[in-house]
Amino acid sequence: MFNLWIELAKKYKIILLEWDLWAGKTLLTKWFAHWLWINENIVQSPTYAYLNSYDDKLLHIDMYRINTEHDIWEKWLNDQISNHEYIAIERPNFIDSLDISNYVTIKIQKDWEKRIVDILE
């Protein structure tokens, strides 16, 4: 899975992460951070903070609590996105309201014994 993540990061600036709770969204972002020479031990889930920024290299957004398009503007998400080299967005609600291009969507479903991965390029 780590190698898949890195190959996608070479092609896309923005990776949208759509999957269940506890399926590994933040873990994948930690792998991505490691690839960018960011200490993966400092990468945390942004669920309650909306976003975590790691220098200008990586922006990690969780849109779980974004309830309206207005929330995107109120949180300055488009400005934040334009200031970072790579962006990982968990649960990308209202994605059409974000000023983004060059992205890929990774959907992961948890099964009792495995994870099912779909990549939408």
Regions found by a protein language model. Give the residues of each.
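Hydrophobic anchor at the beta1->P-loop junction of P-loop NTPases
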Residues: 15-17
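The conserved Walker
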Residues: 21
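Conserved lysine of the Walker
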Residues: 25
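Mid-chain, well-packed structural core segment of small domains
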Residues: 53-86
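Short beta-strand-centered segment that lines the nucleotide-binding/catalytic pocket of NTP-utilizing
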Residues: 39-54
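Short phosphate-coordinating micro-motif centered on Lys-Gly-acidic
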Residues: 70, 78-121
